[in-house]
């Protein structure tokens, strides 16, 4: 085994008060259980990389996606845990991609315009692949490959998260 990566995520968007344990579990299981099992199965193997696809939602939150944000935060923490134990790991907190997918298929033009006004810009596939290649040579447990318009983010945020300040 040379490299390991986690399976795709599941979504079940809702406001926090309407999330049931079952709804949270479905979303957590797709990322948390899969990543933890891969961690356990590979921690004694000589793998060259352990790559997890997280989301900016774990870093900055996302309206209606508390369960998804929690699942992604777990991946980010698992990468730090593995690195603290001398194991390879990186969690990539991806921003928005412009290519339609199961994750973005429900976004319409109005949603994309709102995200843009809030500072979240879509990555082209070429940009995302270039950022992925770069991430594979950077020695960090977590990176956030994303296009962010800091001016727009500052204009719509009560406080800019420290990660995005100068």
Question: What is each PLM-predicted segment?
Answer:
Residues 1-166:
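4′-phosphopantetheine-dependent carrier domains
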């Amino acid at each position: 085994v040379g490299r390991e990566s986690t399976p795709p995520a599941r979504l079940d968007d809702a406001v926090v008060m309407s999330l049931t344990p079952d709804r949270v579990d479905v979303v957590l299981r797709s990322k948390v259980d899969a990543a933890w099992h891969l961690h356990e199965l590979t921690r004694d193997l000589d793998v060259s990389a352990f790559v997890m696809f997280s989301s900016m939602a774990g870093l900055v939150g996302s309206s209606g996606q508390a369960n998804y944000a929690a699942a992604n935060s777990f991946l980010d923490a698992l990468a730090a845990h593995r690195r603290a134990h001398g194991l390879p790991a990186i969690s990539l907190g991806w921003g928005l991609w412009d290519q339609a997918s199961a994750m973005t298929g429900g976004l319409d033009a109005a949603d994309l315009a709102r995200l843009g006004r809030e500072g979240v810009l879509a990555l082209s596939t070429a940009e995302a692949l270039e950022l992925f290649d770069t991430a594979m040579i950077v020695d960090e447990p977590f990176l956030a490959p994303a296009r962010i318009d800091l001016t727009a983010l500052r204009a719509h945020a009560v406080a800019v998260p420290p990660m995005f300040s100068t």
